[in-house]
Amino acid sequence: FINRLIPHILDKEYINKKLVEADQLALKYTNDIATTTGNPILDEYFRQSYLDNFLRGGYPIVVSGSNDDKVLHLFSRKHGDPERDYNQFSTAAEFYSQGDGNFRDVLQNRRCDIIFHPEINEFDIRQFYSLVQIDGYTPMYVKACTFSVIKKHKEDVYKFLDDTVLHGKSKIISALEDRFTAGSLANVILSNNISITISIDEFLHSILDFCQQNYESSTEKVGNYIDQWDYLLDMILCYQRIYPEKIEDLIFKSKVYKYFDSDQTVKPRNEKYFFDGKKARQLDAFYVNTKKYELGYKAEDTNWLKTSSGEIYYTNLIEKLIAIIVNKIALLDPCQMGIEMEANRAGWNDACNGLPSLFGSGMSENFEVARTCHFVKDVLTKYSNHTITVPEELFELYAKVNDSIATCSSGFELWDALATARETYRDKTCYSISGQTVAMDIPDFIHSLDIYINLLSDGVIKAMQLGD
């Protein structure tokens, strides 16, 4: 087939036409950031940066509906560096094409979406904070969202198909029985020559209105990166700039967040610390937990943390923020300067890949934890009338962290106590949580945040002194 197209593709007129189309397409999508300054090169730099951003994070398209709005991120993909084979990428060969990307990369490139596209509202925040695990880590990949028909709307879907599909309805029904993407459904219609009475766009938009949107993600057998979560707070701060009047509802009232459930389990220290008589090393810091598969974990699905009764656990954003803070404080290194690289991976900088084996820690993450502490302190001080609950397992970790900080007399003793507390917590939350929650005293937690902030600040001072 491709060989037959060669004469057409090599035709100069065809090539010139495609160049014009490419320019027009780039201009269309970068008009969001069109800027006129005294320097035309700077103007084009803005456009190019914006283009590069959404070619990795995706360009948000809102599909409005009578039930709720859906958001599709067109063009999303892993960044493709020609010199690094492991950064190869692919996008689906379909309309509304989306691809998979690394969590950190996609998060980095979507964190300002709300500024250019206020119509997406809370979507990005809900997606990425839901993918944060109960241990504060995140999965490796963010995948294209899928859709599934809501059970109560099945009859509405059948009626809609009766009204709009002239023939081939059974193939569409078959496609709707499982999770699907907007593009895959369009492919079913086109590849089977199914006749519909409205445009494909109208048809897809109507179908999606009867569906729930599913966040999709997966792990890679490499461990957990220390910095995957670093840009999460930026999303909230950008949202606050656009919708300051909605920040209270965002933080406290929307109980739609879940916890991603990973098949990767971080080993306790006695299983990853090695000493050969001369040198200590931290190696093979995680394992793929096959017991989870025996309990129903599905590698091909996106798995969510469940309670002991088998129900997916839902919560609000304030709990997710608290979970991040407490887990990260429990990861302070023996000098309380940085956050430990204890799960097999460093951060984005590949030159640091050897640091986890050398018990490395990250100062950048210290700054991010401190920023998150300051933000949570501000919102809790301003909106102190809310009741905050957290899973009893998380509350127990929080209590042990505070007790350790209050009673330990040395940095190493504190590190050992914090590490023991987090290992116990991970054992209790590895497969499920009880589902029982504990109310937190807001003034007490604000006081704890002050302690954490001071501890982190002291760590920065130590690092600066060490650097001098």
Role assignments for model-derived ranges:
Residues 1-468:
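Acidic, mature catalytic/reactive cores of soluble proteins
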